């Protein structure tokens, strides 16, 4: 019985981690969708938003919205470095319907505006 109990605990621990990895992969592959948010992901994976929020926060030490924003801003940085698109277009490419909100999130995560980030990149500071 002790062995069975231990195995069940291992399964319980492993399964949430697998779910979280699938959710993270889904976000990383679909961050461009402007509607990407907790409710959409919860529906996709058949969880209540409250349960998914708690599971993600417990496993990743950050909420889903923060994770989505981090993925989007990292993608925006890659687009900025390519120097092929205007910043307003980059905000759309990475899933932000509102360019002002994109600037706010970018500055919050990177400590500077997208334009300043690009300048720092070319100066070798990032």
Where do the protein language model's features map onto the residues?
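C-terminal interaction modules of eukaryotic adaptor/scaffold proteins
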Residues: 116
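Terminal helix-turn-helix DNA-binding modules in bacterial transcription factors
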Residues: 25, 58-97, 119-126
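Amphipathic alpha-helical surface "interface" segments used
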Residues: 20, 24, 43-46
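Short, Lys/Arg-enriched anionic-surface-contact patches
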Residues: 10-21, 54, 62-71
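Basic, amphipathic alpha-helical hairpins
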Residues: 1-12, 24-36, 56-60, 77-86, ...
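Basic/polar phosphate-binding segments, predominantly the helix-turn-helix DNA-binding elements
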Residues: 39-68, 91-113
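The cytosolic transmitter module of two-component sensor histidine kinases
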Residues: 16-20, 38, 87
